[in-house]
Amino acid sequence: MKLMYALWGSRLQEALFAERLREQLAALGATRLQINIADADVAPAQLRLTTYEQPVGAIVSVWIPDEFAAVTGLLTAAADRVAGWVVDERTPIPPPESDNGVRADALAGLALLRIPAGMDRSEWLRRWQDDHTTVAIETQATFGYVQNTVIETLTADARADALVEELFPMAAMTDPHAFYGSGGDDAELGRRVSRMIESTSTFGASTDVDVIPTSRYVYDLTGVRPTG
């Protein structure tokens, strides 16, 4: 199963990248760890949205068959605040592989989506995954696209129904043409932006959404052994 957590805190960089955390997760049976952190490398990113008092500082993903409560406990100890979910992962565009523990050469944008009041979950999923996916791929310069639908909450106040990760060129932090893949054509940029806004509005992703620009790190935990 894939677990995902939103974390807040002033010591996330130190706590999340500590070797000890990887050892503890591996000891629980975790096979893979992904850290998406809002760090200095993505500080220039212009697209940021938050529904919380403080923006999310990191999104952590853990692949593990069980021991969900123990994983939640480890990450709770690493942060000031944690929200966690069990998710069902879909990969319309599989992200490129990167070296173990090395920053991916990308702006990794994370979005927390919520079902609008009055909309049925099945209809929301249809509009998002069936209708919008193609629009997102055709209007943006994404080279990695992962959709994570929440199937269970792991913490209180974990208010999200899906978490989306999209990888963009680093230039997309400040250049709309690099973000939308419009090749410097202002008219094409406008067309793509309009199409994207129209599509996101059909399933509530234009409001009540968090957007977090991050750096992406992936660790293979299958060979990690506790040192004591």
Regions found by a protein language model. Give the residues of each.
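Macromolecular interaction modules
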Residues: 1-228
